[in-house]
Amino acid sequence: MSKITEKSSKVNSEWRSICPITNTLDLLGDKWTLVLIRDLFLGKCTYSEFQASPEGIPTNILASRLKRLLDNNVIVKEAYQERPVRYAYILTAKGKALAPIIKEIVNWGLKHIPGTDDKLAKEYLKKNKRSAF
């Protein structure tokens, strides 16, 4: 087994590791980010729609997670109203590439977590069957 040395494993200063699991979890693995990704796949795209999700994301956390997803090109924002300026958040190709992962998380939750909301999961799978998978 090869030993990773400091010279051979220069880490981008933005990330704390060269491990793809660690870095993916740093980007997506908190309590709220995957809920936002789910909502985007379900067709929600505005700040107020994200706030209306049943999980009740606090506004400061919502703003922070949207910024992180924007900064990492997982989503883009487009103005849909000029006065006052309002934005729609849209998955990029990079964001849409998460679809099979989200699908597997949904399926795993349905199988292994009692009381999982079948209706929401089925809505997700149905909405994303055509375009994302």
Residue positions per predicted region:
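N-terminal leader segment of winged-helix/HTH proteins
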Residues: 1-28
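A positively charged, amphipathic N-terminal helix/segment that binds anionic biomolecules
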Residues: 3, 67, 89
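N-terminal helix-turn-helix DNA-binding core of bacterial DNA-binding proteins
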Residues: 19-61
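Basic, amphipathic "hinge/linker" alpha-helix immediately C-terminal to the N-terminal HTH DNA-binding motif
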Residues: 29, 81-105
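Canonical helix-turn-helix DNA-binding module
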Residues: 48-84
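Amphipathic alpha-helical dimerization/coiled-coil segments
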Residues: 100-133
